[in-house]
Design a protein with these regions (language model features):
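Short alpha-helical segments that sit at the start of domains
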Residues: 1-21
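Conserved short strand/loop->alpha-helix "switch" segment adjacent to the catalytic nucleotide/phosphoryl-transfer site
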Residues: 28, 34-39, 95-117
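Conserved beta-strand-loop-beta-strand hairpin that lines the nucleotide-binding pocket
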Residues: 66-77, 121-149
Length: 149
C-alpha cells in the first residue's frame, strides 16, 4: 500500500522560498528549480508550483523553459520649471515617487524621501533645466528613481 504525505509549509516559509526564487531570478541563476529545491530541502514540484503562482500573479514572466524575469513597471513624469513643478522638492516627491512606495515600511519611505530630495534639489539648485524627466521603475524586489535634466 502506498501512502502519500502532504506537507503544507507555513506562510512565512512559503514567503521565504518565494523571495529566494525572486532573488535567484534577478541574479539569472541557472537551474532555478533545482537550486531552490536543494537550498530549502523541498521537492522540485513544490518549487514549480510556486513559480507558476508567481507567473499567474504577474510578478514574474516566463522567457523560455526554466528561464524567467521579474515583471517591471515604468512610470514617466515630465516636470517643468515654468509650471512651478520645480519650486520645491516635496512636489516632485509627492507626485512622482510617493504613490509607488506608500506601502513600504516608514523607515524605507523616510530613506527614499531623503535620497529623492537630495537628487531633485541638485537639479533645482544647480542645473537650472527647464524640463526634468523623472522615471520610476519598479518590480517586486527593487524600486529605481531616475532624474534626467
Amino acid at each position: 500500500m502506498r501512502r502519500c504525505i502532504s506537507v503544507k509549509f507555513s506562510e512565512d516559509r512559503k514567503q521565504n522560498i518565494n523571495r529566494y526564487i525572486l532573488e535567484k531570478i534577478q541574479q539569472n541563476s541557472p537551474s532555478l528549480s533545482r537550486t531552490v529545491a536543494e537550498t530549502f530541502g523541498v521537492n522540485p514540484s513544490t518549487i514549480h508550483s510556486y513559480i507558476n503562482e508567481l507567473v499567474r500573479k504577474q510578478i514574474i514572466r516566463k522567457i523560455k523553459r526554466g528561464e524567467y524575469e521579474l515583471v517591471s513597471h515604468k512610470w514617466d513624469y515630465p516636470l517643468q520649471r515654468s509650471a512651478g513643478d520645480l519650486d520645491n522638492d516635496t512636489y516632485a516627491f509627492d507626485k512622482c515617487l510617493s504613490p509607488h512606495i506608500k506601502d513600504f515600511a516608514n523607515n524605507i519611505q523616510d530613506i527614499w524621501s531623503y535620497v529623492f530630495s537630495e537628487m531633485i534639489n541638485n537639479v533645482m539648485d544647480h542645473s537650472m533645466a527647464e524640463n526634468v524627466q523623472i522615471r520610476i521603475i519598479q518590480n517586486f524586489l527593487t524600486t529605481t528613481a531616475i532624474i534626467a535634466d
